[in-house]
Amino acid sequence: MGLISKIARGLVRGADRMAECTSKQGPNSYNKGRGAKKIGYLTASGKFVKVREMVPVFVVPDLTGFKLKPYVSYKAPPGTEDPMTAKKLFMETVGPQIEKDLQEGTFRPEDLEKYGFEPTQEGKLFKLFPRNYIQ
């Protein structure tokens, strides 16, 4: 009966692997844990050895003289500025310079590096728009 009910539950609810095994369903020695990272290892004799390199270290910046508060109230008014779009960013950064060069007649499409265009992303840590560049 147990097998049929589990199959029926799988068909009705879908495959739910997280709810399958709990501490109530396992043996008394079963402890699922909370998903914390291990900071050491168990030896063959069952002794736990703590490894200093595996212990997480939290780096907290010095916030003396920092003006902003760490909490934003839910009663704070919503922002009045429109969300940033690619066109808006372009028009605020490079657009005026290109328009000025077009009016003066000095704009050359093959000299886009002057405006910050990068033809390749060699040496970059993060590749932006990888489909636009030749691999």
Curated annotation (Swiss-Prot):
One of its GO terms (molecular function) is structural constituent of ribosome. The keyword Transcription does not apply. Its main location: mitochondrion. Residues 1-13 form a transit peptide. It comes from the Eukaryota. GO terms for cellular component: mitochondrial large ribosomal subunit; ribonucleoprotein complex. It is found in: Mitochondrion. GO terms for biological process: apoptotic process; translation. Keywords: Apoptosis, Cell cycle, Mitochondrion, Ribonucleoprotein, Ribosomal protein, Transit peptide. The keyword Isomerase does not apply. Component of the mitochondrial ribosome large subunit (39S) which comprises a 16S rRNA and about 50 distinct proteins. Component of the mitochondrial ribosome large subunit. Also involved in apoptosis and cell cycle. Belongs to the mitochondrion-specific ribosomal protein mL41 family. This is Large ribosomal subunit protein mL41A. It comes from Xenopus laevis (African clawed frog). The lineage of its organism: Eukaryota, Metazoa, Chordata, Craniata, Vertebrata. The gene is mrpl41-a.
